[in-house]
């Protein structure tokens, strides 16, 4: 596959977040509401689309838990399938809750505390010390921080090879400060004008704006975007349809929630141009 520019996702591509972000989703809902979803269900929300932002995924998981309490007769499979059919994301999750009677809907809304969920999530993920530094206040709970439990997935030799041969950018749903920590951990130096984080755009994946803008900044002709979710591949597909002046490739990486042959099939169905076992295989795939 020929490309002159490579754009990388962070979570599930450069660092393993199964024990950090995904754990924080599950435990935030548990701490706020006393029950939660199973961690494998997070991938079902991701596959439904529109959940690049893990705070919003946490909000949607909480909605599911609260709606079930109020009589919503759906399991997580049915709930996420319906979310997907409605276009994905938090707005779709809220629409599913609209199946409840009005009084039950009102009770769900009254109990749904997005601020408490976000503060709990950040305290669990960052830990008390980083929470005080980055959030500017006292954490609601004392924790060591799951951010310290993120094994790297990319070899130093891969970073050296890819940055020597390609213009390299980053497109991630992380806040900028948390992206800095992950990029420093893997040894990837990406200037601010060559990356998009949660702080830089509102639309989120799979909207193509950020990827197209990165391509413009690089003056690229052929852009490969590697990510671990279906929305990453959809972002590349949407960019290819939107920007007629360039070619965009979507590459699925099997070190996130999608793995094995089932993961390959899902990526292929989403329009992936290639699927790799891990980010290190990009060295051989790209030329």
What do these predicted ranges mean?
Residues 49-150:
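A metal-dependent, Asp-based hydrolase signature
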Residues 171-224, 229-241, 248:
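Substrate-recognition "cap/lid" segment bordering the active-site pocket of phosphatases
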Residues 188-199, 262-287:
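Structural recognition of alpha->loop->beta junctions
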């Amino acid at each position: 596959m020929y490309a002159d520019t490579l754009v990388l996702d962070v979570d599930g591509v450069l660092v393993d977040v199964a024990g950090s972000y995904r754990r924080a989703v599950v435990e935030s809902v548990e701490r706020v509401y006393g029950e939660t979803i199973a961690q494998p269900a997070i991938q079902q929300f991701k596959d439904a689309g529109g959940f690049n932002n893990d705070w919003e995924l946490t909000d949607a998981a909480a909605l599911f838990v609260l709606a079930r309490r109020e009589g919503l007769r759906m399991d997580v499979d049915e709930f996420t399938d319906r979310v997907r059919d409605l276009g994905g994301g938090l707005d779709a999750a809220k629409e599913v809750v609209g199946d409840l009677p009005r009084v039950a809907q009102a009770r769900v809304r009254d109990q749904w505390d997005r601020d408490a969920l976000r503060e709990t999530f950040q305290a669990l993920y960052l830990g008390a010390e980083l929470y005080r530094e980055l959030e500017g206040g006292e954490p609601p709970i004392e924790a060591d921080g799951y951010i310290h439990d993120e094994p790297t997935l990319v070899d130093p030799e891969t970073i050296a090879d890819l940055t020597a041969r390609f213009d390299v950018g980053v497109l991630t749903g992380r806040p900028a400060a948390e992206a800095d920590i992950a990029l420093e951990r893997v040894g990837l130096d990406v200037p601010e004008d060559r990356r998009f984080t949660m702080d830089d755009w509102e639309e989120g994946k799979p909207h193509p704006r950020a990827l197209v803008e990165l391509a413009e900044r690089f003056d690229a002709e052929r852009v490969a975007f590697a990510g671990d979710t279906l929305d990453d591949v959809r972002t590349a597909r949407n960019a290819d349809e939107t920007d007629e002046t360039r070619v965009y490739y979507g590459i699925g990486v099997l070190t996130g929630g999608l793995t094995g042959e089932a993961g390959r099939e899902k990526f292929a169905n989403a329009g992936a141009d290639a699927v790799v076992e891990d980010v290190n295989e990009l060295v051989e795939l790209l030329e």
